[in-house]
Amino acid sequence: MSPAASHKKAQPNASDALFIYYLEGVIHPATPMPHPDFLGNWVEETSTFLFFGSPADDMVQGFCRSMSHLTFIDRYEMTYEQWQGGDAEPFTAGGLTITPFRKGTPPEGRPGPGDIFLDAGVVFGNGAHPTTSSCLSLLARLGPELAGQTVQDLGTGTGLLALGAARLGAEKVLAVDLNHLAVRTTLANARINGLTRQIVAVQGRAEEMVHAPADLVVSNIHYDIMKHLVVSEGFLIKKEAILSGLMTTEARTIEQVLKSKGFLIADHLSPDGIWHTFHVKRG
């Protein structure tokens, strides 16, 4: 997530605007935000990003004055489409039709057994990335094997892979993300899709939560986390995993580590030759 790489002002339409405030210092997620268009609080390590649907300069500056540990860094203004990297259209992956929508207004009707309605909110990623599609494709290839299984989705983000696993037959899915905003978004998407009985979303670190029992681990996550995850005690006792979020050099390294730990590469997808996704099984 890197707002600093985006244009600071992109002339968004008033109804489609995002106002993002970058602060050094952490504002606890439970802190009340007295603003009618407050959308979310994204905490990353020692920084906070506050999202609003309209300007909140006075309120944010007030926070910085009243909390000595906060420093205002920057303010960004853009559209939802620019934040997500484009206006997402419905797409199909793993035999599922994913229909993105925004601002809590889902498409008309209820999602069918092959449908997922996805509201990314301000959590980065609308599901169209090739790693996401590859993970869904590999989940679909498991077919009947998913029935009755418990799945972990580590680094769940918007919850799409958790939703996909549940739609494809998993009995229980534990969706994990370090960011509380991602957890909240995943829970909202589970409700919209009628999957709250199957999906539990919790805040935590992938390397720690992998210790929970599961038949299958799914993780589409940054390499800096993946390299620790695949050597963690909790991962090494797992029988099967789908791993993604890896560029070519990173994928080679992870593949070598997995093989050295006794895993077999059951499948390997890289539709664009850049991003790689592995289905691995304990040998």
Residue ranges, per PLM feature:
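N-terminal auxiliary segments of SAM/dcSAM-dependent transferases
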Residues: 2-107
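A short linear hydrophobic-aromatic micro-motif
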Residues: 36-41, 148, 263-268
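A short helix-to-beta-strand connector/capping loop
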Residues: 71, 94, 112-113, 171, ...
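SAM-dependent Rossmann-like transferase core, predominantly class I methyltransferases
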Residues: 83-145
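Conserved SAM/SAH cofactor-binding pocket of Class I
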Residues: 126-206
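S-adenosylmethionine
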Residues: 178-283
